[in-house]
Every structure is written in structure tokens, then in C-alpha cells.
Amino acid sequence: MGFLHEGHKSLIVRAAAENDRVVVSDFVNPTQFGPTEDLESYPRDFERDCKLCEEAGAALVFHPEPSEMYAPNACTYVNMDELTHELCGLTRPIHFRGVCTVVSKLFHIVCPDRAYFGQKDAQQLAVIRRMVRDLNFDIQIVGCPIIREEDGLAKSSRNTYLSAEERTAALCLSRAVFAGQKMVEAGERDAKTVLDAMRAIIEAEPLAKIDYVKMVDFENIVQIDKIEDVPVLCAMAVYIGKTRLIDNFIYDPAEDAGCGCGCGGDSCCCCGA
């Protein structure tokens, strides 16, 4: 969506290493913003973005005007009946309709062999994978790890909204993520136990207000009570002041058990790609 940072750069660098040409979409998509959200104030700096893309190895930056992507009387959207009613979809009801629509259009225009998405927007990653499967796009979706600041905060364009005090307060998200991940990796399998511990860390921060902290089946985005034999997503959205931030971790029991498929975590066996 533009105002690129080191997280985006890591996607471009990986894509450039694995492909002949890389096209970067730099487009603030109006259809994924609700009427009270930050479309107008969302940070933009196209020249800065182009420099980052060039340094990372991109061949082309796709930067259309909204009027080029959406005709004045446009009335066709890509909507998903499942995966979009939990987590961010609960409080952002039109968000994923906008995401699916614009990504479908980008795929039709660019015709990529692979598309790279960051894990920070993990629900979006699951939604795009399902859309690609359901609509028979001949595209490999590659999920890439969250890139963090040195103190743990997940990189985000919206971090620029934070005051110095809020920036410090925002570290409660990564502290909660790391604590929950440590519990799960140590063998805790009860979702409520993990989530309660994570919520307690966030609730101890006066500037933080929880939107959600939930654990779901990563492929289907359905809440679970216990970690069993499928990859799980433990995700949160938290307001720090007026700024809504997200963070998460993904746990795959197959990786702990030692997956025997030989895929190295990059095939459908281990990551749903």
C-alpha cells in the first residue's frame, strides 16, 4: 500500500533472489478502508518508495491512480464467504472484500508466477491463499516472516502515527506475542491459558486498548480451544492511543514433530502455499 519499510523491502529482496523480474505494487487501495478509517491520512511517499524498491532489486513499481483501478460506476467485487468474519474482519467488515478485489485485479494485470506477502498480515495471507485456490489463479503465494525493529515492534507504516510515549507503549504487543509463543513452544496446548497470559501483558499497559486477541486454525480462520494437529495463528489487534496495530505468531505442530515430507516448510504440507 505504499510508504514502504524494511518489512516490505525483505519481500522484494527475497522475490528478486527467486525470480527473473520483480514488480512491486505501490497503491493505497481505497476499497479496503472503512468510512471512519485512515485512507486520507495514510502515509505516502512515492519517491522514497521507488528508491527502496530499486535498492531491493525491483524491476518495476506499479503505481496506478485510483481512477485507473476503479471506474466511476464500478460495481464488481471479489467477496469471500469464509475466513473474513473473524479477527480483523469483525471490526473491518468491508476490508477483505477490498483486499480480494484489488489483489485479483493486480494478478490479472501483472500475471505473476509468484506473489509475496508478509506474515504480519496473517489473515490476509490466509485469505489470498484461499482466493487463489478457489479462483484457479496459477500463482504461488509465498508467505514471508515478520520483520521487527530491534526492540521487537513489528514494522508497520502506521508506526509513524505513534508519539514517543505511544511508541514505547506499543512494545506490549511484541511482548505478548513472544510470551504466548514461548508458552506454546514449551508445550502449552490450551488456547485460553495462552490468550489470558497475552491479554494480561497488554492490559497492563495504560495506553493499550485490545480490539482482539484470538487463536484460530490458520488455514480456515476458525477459533480453536486447543492446539492439536493443524497450524494455528495467534493474532491480535490493539489500539495504542488512536493507532490500531496488529501482531501475531504462527505455530505449526508438524514442524515441532519434524515434518517428513522434505518440503522444507515451503510446500502445501507445511505452510499452505
Question: Which stretches of residues belong to each language-model region?
Answer:
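Phosphate/ribose-recognition catalytic cores of enzymes acting on nucleotide-derived substrates
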Residues: 197-273
